Amino acid sequence: MENKELETNIPESEIAADAAVETPAFDDAAQKEKEEQAREAKIAADKLLPPDPDALLEVRHLKKHFILKKTLMGKPLSTLKAVDDVSFTVKPGETLGIVGESGCGKTTMGRTILKLHQPTDGQIFFEGKDIAGYSPKEMRALRTKMQIVFQDPYSSLPPRSTVGGILAEPVKVHNIVPKAEVKDYVLQIMEQCGLRDYYYERYPHEFSGGQRQRICIARALTVDPKLVVCDEPVSALDVSIQAQIINLLKKIQEERNLTYLFISHDLSVVKYISDKIGVMYLGSMVEFGEKDEIFDNPMHPYTNALFSAVPNPNPDEKVQRIILKGDIPSPANPPMGCKFHTRCPRAMEICKHIAPEYKEYGKGHFVACHACEQES
């Protein structure tokens, strides 16, 4: 029996018309202007809302942009959007883990929250007060409540000061205890961080990386903070030492009811220590939620790709690796529409032109993805 091609009597003009309907034309300039107007309207509306009474830290539409080039008249010509419209809340005693590839804006966001960088726009509520517009003098009074542990323990300690001098300085500056009690107070903090008393007179170069990071943690604790930003605190350490530092951070959190903003690219570490997880890509939060919800039900394609890269210790359980094609676009020139569409395996035509809305798909589970929106 001969194979015959199916014939159709539908005019070509009608086929072309149907194709035009299925693939709508986008005016990128008009669409971009429309998106900006909608975003500004939402930001203006959210600014009128009261802060979350249960949150220690609440971030709304936070932006940090760096001007790369200016015209002769001083007008910005090129801008790097390191942090672009990020929102989340953290309750007292919780740990929020922030994950993403290098260059996604994790560290910049953490430093902007502490106002080590001045925010370009947005609100930062700490204990119910918006500190985004605080002056350096006003922030000085808050430094005892907000501290940071830096990534590199080798460069974050002054080499000419002893451990005792390093830890005693913030205690004296902020008048934490009377001068006569400073040394005893510092020794107590050192003991809590697993540091021997005789380390008090030693210098940073005499210690290993793990011991130096313990000193950095002790320095943050000397002023009795409520929020500690941990900026990849174990990435420069050996794996065996990493476990010790993570366990130390958890022990101290339980003893002092600390709140952590834990920045890392190691998903196994984040899963162990975090209560909530935020996933960032090119300066934006693409997914946010409770730890168990994010790991059990990752919705954003980028989150799925990150999780598929984690080695599985069970050799009998095969995990399909999701390989992202292409390089990460430049934050100074991000793609139009969804920033992830150039690498996304589920990208659609709409993703190239319209940025997805960051919306809630379950209790506390926020995602910014057109594919998730169509499936819901």
Where do the language-model regions lie?
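Short catalytic/signature loops enriched in Gly
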Residues: R39-A55, L68-G74, T79, E290-S376
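Helix-to-loop junction immediately C-terminal to a conserved catalytic motif
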Residues: L114
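Conserved ABC transporter NBD signature motif
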Residues: G122-D130, L142
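Conserved ABC ATPase "signature" region
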Residues: D130, A180-Y198, F307
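Conserved ABC ATPase signature
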Residues: Y203-F207, Q211
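A short, proline-enriched helix->beta-strand linker immediately N-terminal to the Walker B motif
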Residues: T222-K226
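P-loop NTP-binding/switch modules centered on Walker-like glycine-rich loops
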Residues: V229, P233-L237, I241-V319
